[in-house]
């Protein structure tokens, strides 16, 4: 048997460090066993998937030194490797399940589903919705079918009491109650599969032997095992890695820490150091050494050494490790070249010069005006904001609301950023000049910078958002009570904007 592993990210946003973490362990496991590592793009969510996001995933994983044997860009015998290009394949298997009575067409509307869930909640029923809850009479189904009402295809799941036993490479046997497993949607009304169907079909057809993924998928394993049984296929070996955590032990999220690989690239981290750090997430070298290369990790890799305690992604620890790599592995010439490749190259200079050229009298004027673009910390304090018109509490609210609003943006272009911020300023009833003042300080360290929108484009979305988070903390942060109040006000503001747009 040839060991085959895979990583299957969704191209719906910036490439996540969690994707790199899962990819690294899949790569190491495959290489250790003389096998193959596959990259698959799970783009069934066509409303959110973008080619730009896919390319960013490919570029980021390669920047980290993670290479795959098969994938959308390198091809392979099991392709295509984008799920959006496999729609006809999934349709065949959905029909197979329908013909065998393992799935059913569900014509229930969103309103009906909401009513069903509300009634169950009121009755104190906590089990998942099953086919007996969802299926219509033959007459009702025929009427809806004749009316052309859209339907989804759902899988049938056990309704009797009992448990599904999931065998995990790290955890052993796990018993999961069937009562909590719902009649999962397998095919959406647009004909695209959900993750659960596409995942199982692709893993089988691509001959994946070991499914190494995050522990958030443990509760979905019964559905996947059931699908393998329905199709009469062998179940691959499951291995669920522990989730990355914030220092406060909560799940790693961009609301508390930068999670995009692009952030770390733009902030000046070495790819070797970031990969090294991800390799230490729940795993350790036999000699407990903290600094090691991918090749050294491969040489000593044993997945049994993975610890199930939630590994903490601590940026301070990453900073320390990155410093070791700079000092111990780069001579002066190599470091100079890394600096050029990172920021001080012609492409970057040409992007910046138009924003400062008209203000320059000597070449010496250039660096003071743009140094904030290359700085990891700006050294701002509460005092930095006191010259602005809004009081400090209102400035903090502006920064937090701006951060939340910018989080919703699909593109990061100047005009889009301006429209987003202006709309928020209007909604909050604040003059744009006063609204932007705290953002100038947060992004550039002063109010004397060139356009804050241009600065945010040059910094990129991740660095920009990270600086806004820092500024909120500088102004005292948002504790639980304040955050709850902010969230309520922001939700009301968003609702007003939606109603205004509808008119």
Curated annotation (Swiss-Prot):
It comes from Saccharophagus degradans (strain 2-40 / ATCC 43961 / DSM 17024). The gene is gltX. It comes from the Bacteria. This is Glutamate--tRNA ligase. PROSITE patterns: AA_TRNA_LIGASE_I. Pfam families: Anticodon_2, tRNA-synt_1c. It is found in: Cytoplasm. Belongs to the class-I aminoacyl-tRNA synthetase family. Glutamate--tRNA ligase type 1 subfamily. Catalyzes the attachment of glutamate to tRNA(Glu) in a two-step reaction: glutamate is first activated by ATP to form Glu-AMP and then transferred to the acceptor end of tRNA(Glu). GO terms for biological process: glutamyl-tRNA aminoacylation. CDD domains: GluRS_core. A motif ('HIGH' region) lies at residues 9-19. SUPFAM superfamilies: An anticodon-binding domain of class I aminoacyl-tRNA synthetases, Nucleotidylyl transferase. Its EC number is 6.1.1.17. One of its GO terms (cellular component) is cytosol. It is an enzyme of class 6 (ligase). GO terms for molecular function: ATP binding; glutamate-tRNA ligase activity; tRNA binding; zinc ion binding. A motif ('KMSKS' region) lies at residues 251-255. ATP binds at residue 254. It catalyses: tRNA(Glu) + L-glutamate + ATP = L-glutamyl-tRNA(Glu) + AMP + diphosphate. Keywords: Aminoacyl-tRNA synthetase, ATP-binding, Cytoplasm, Ligase, Nucleotide-binding, Protein biosynthesis. InterPro entries: aa-tRNA-synth_I_cd-bd, aa-tRNA-synth_I_codon-bd_sub2, aa-tRNA-synth_I_CS, aa_tRNA-synth_I_cd-bd_sf, Glu-tRNA-ligase_bac/mito, Glu/Gln-tRNA-synth, Glu/Gln-tRNA-synth_Ib_cat-dom, GluQ/Sye. The keyword Ligase applies. Monomer. HAMAP family: Glu_tRNA_synth_type1 (MF_00022).
């Amino acid at each position: 048997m040839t060991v085959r592993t895979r990583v299957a990210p969704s191209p719906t946003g910036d490439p996540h460090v969690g994707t790199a973490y899962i990819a690294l362990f899949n790569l190491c496991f495959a290489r250790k066993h003389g096998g193959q590592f596959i990259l698959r793009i799970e783009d069934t969510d066509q409303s959110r998937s973008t080619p730009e996001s896919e390319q960013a995933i490919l570029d980021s994983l390669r920047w980290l030194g993670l290479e795959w044997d098969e994938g959308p860009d390198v091809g392979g015998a099991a392709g295509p490797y984008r799920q959006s290009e496999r729609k006809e394949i999934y349709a065949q298997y959905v029909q197979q399940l329908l013909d065998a009575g393992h799935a059913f067409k569900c014509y229930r509307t969103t309103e009906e589903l909401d009513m069903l869930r509300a009634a169950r909640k009121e009755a104190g029923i906590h089990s998942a919705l099953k086919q007996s809850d969802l299926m219509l009479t033959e007459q009702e189904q025929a009427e809806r079918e004749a009316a052309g009402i859209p339907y989804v295809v759902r899988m049938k799941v056990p309704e009797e009491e009992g448990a599904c036993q999931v065998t995990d490479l790290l955890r052993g046997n796990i018993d999961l109650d069937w009562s909590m497993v719902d009649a999962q949607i397998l095919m959406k009304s647009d004909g695209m599969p959900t993750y659960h169907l596409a995942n199982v079909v692709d893993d089988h057809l691509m001959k994946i032997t070991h499914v190494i993924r995050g522990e958030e998928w443990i509760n979905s394993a019964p559905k996947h095992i059931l699908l393998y049984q329905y199709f009469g296929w062998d179940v691959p070996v499951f291995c669920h890695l522990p989730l990355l955590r914030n220092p406060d032990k909560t799940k790693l999220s961009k609301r508390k820490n930068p999670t995009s690989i692009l952030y770390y690239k733009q902030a000046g981290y070495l790819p070797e150091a970031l990969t090294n750090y991800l390799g230490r997430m729940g795993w350790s070298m036999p000699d407990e050494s903290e600094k090691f290369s991918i090749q050294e990790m491969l040489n000593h890799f044993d997945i049994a050494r993975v610890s199930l305690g939630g590994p903490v992604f601590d940026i301070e620890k990453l900073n320390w490790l990155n410093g070791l790599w700079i000092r111990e592995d780069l001579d002066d010439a190599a470091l100079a070249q890394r600096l050029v490749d990172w920021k001080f190259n012609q492409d970057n200079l040409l992007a910046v010069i138009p924003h400062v050229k008209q203000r320059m009298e000597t070449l010496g004027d250039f660096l003071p005006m743009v140094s904030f673009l290359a700085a990891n910390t700006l050294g701002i304090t509460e005092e930095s904001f006191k010259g602005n018109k809004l009081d400090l509490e209102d400035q903090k609210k502006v920064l937090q609301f701006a951060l939340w609003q910018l989080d919703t943006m699909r593109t990061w272009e100047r005009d889009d950023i301006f429209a987003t911020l202006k709309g928020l300023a209007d909604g909050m009833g604040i003059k744009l000049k006063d609204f932007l003042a705290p953002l100038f300080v947060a992004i550039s360290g002063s109010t004397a910078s060139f356009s804050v929108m241009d600065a945010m484009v040059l910094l990129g979305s991740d660095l920009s958002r990270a600086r806004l988070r820092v500024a909120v903390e500088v102004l005292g942060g948002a504790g639980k009570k304040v955050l709850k109040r902010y969230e309520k006000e922001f939700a009301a503001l968003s609702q007003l904007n939606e109603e205004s747009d509808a008119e």
